């Protein structure tokens, strides 16, 4: 796992060069946007249960066969596993946002996820749909446009961080499908 700082150091070391120029400017921007980044992570973490349960509910509303006998969310145990997986995915998305780097998401969450879902018979199209609902909710909370809750946010535009979270969710969807 690399954070924004480690990534710059590794890249500079590979070039046998000092950290400077555009790398240094990128780190300055990362630090300047630190409060917005922390507030964005907090918006996701504070609303994680809501984000995940809404995503799973939306997925089921669009595919009621999931809760019918034989469906992948039929029985409390399977529903709990589905909610747990959603929480884990969202947690790693928040870790990536905090670090400013997707490697933690890639290495510890997405590596082998599709193969695991296929082995368990989890319908990937439904999982991708749940991730897209989580993406929309997380972006809404970061940009403070979620209809049910308004939070104090850092001054300034958080659209870049919302786009960053959206890109991490897109990585999850691509890894599953």
From Swiss-Prot:
Task: Kindly provide the PTM information from the record.
Answer: Contains two covalently linked phycoerythrobilin chromophores and one covalently linked phycourobilin chromophore.
- Chain sites annotated for binding (2R,3E)-phycoerythrobilin 2: 158
Q: Which GO terms describe its cellular component?
A: chloroplast thylakoid membrane; phycobilisome
**Keywords linked to the UniProt accession:** Antenna complex, Bile pigment, Chloroplast, Chromophore, Electron transport, Membrane, Methylation, Photosynthesis, Phycobilisome, Plastid, Thylakoid, Transport
Under CDD domains, the record lists: PE_beta-like
A Pfam family of this chain: Phycobilisome
Its biological purpose is as follows: Light-harvesting photosynthetic bile pigment-protein from the phycobiliprotein complex.
Which protein is depicted?
R-phycoerythrin beta chain
Q: Which organism is it from?
A: Porphyra purpurea (Red seaweed)
Q: Which gene encodes it?
A: cpeB
């Amino acid at each position: 796992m690399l954070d924004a700082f480690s990534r710059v150091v590794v890249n500079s070391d590979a070039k046998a060069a000092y950290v400077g120029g555009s790398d240094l400017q990128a780190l300055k921007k990362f630090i300047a946007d630190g409060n917005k980044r922390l507030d964005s992570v907090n918006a996701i973490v504070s609303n994680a249960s809501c984000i995940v349960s809404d995503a799973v509910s939306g997925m089921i509303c669009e595919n009621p066969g999931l809760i019918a006998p034989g469906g992948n969310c039929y029985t409390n145990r399977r529903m709990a596993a589905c909610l747990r997986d959603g929480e884990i995915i969202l947690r790693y998305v928040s870790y990536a946002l905090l670090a400013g780097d997707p490697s933690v998401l890639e290495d510890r969450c997405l590596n082998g996820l599709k193969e695991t879902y296929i082995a368990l018979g989890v319908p990937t199209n439904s999982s991708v749909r749940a991730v897209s609902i989580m993406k929309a909710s997380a972006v809404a909370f970061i940009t403070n446009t979620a209809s049910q809750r308004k939070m104090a946010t850092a001054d300034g535009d958080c659209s870049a961080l919302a786009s960053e979270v959206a890109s991490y969710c897109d990585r999850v969807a691509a890894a599953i499908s």
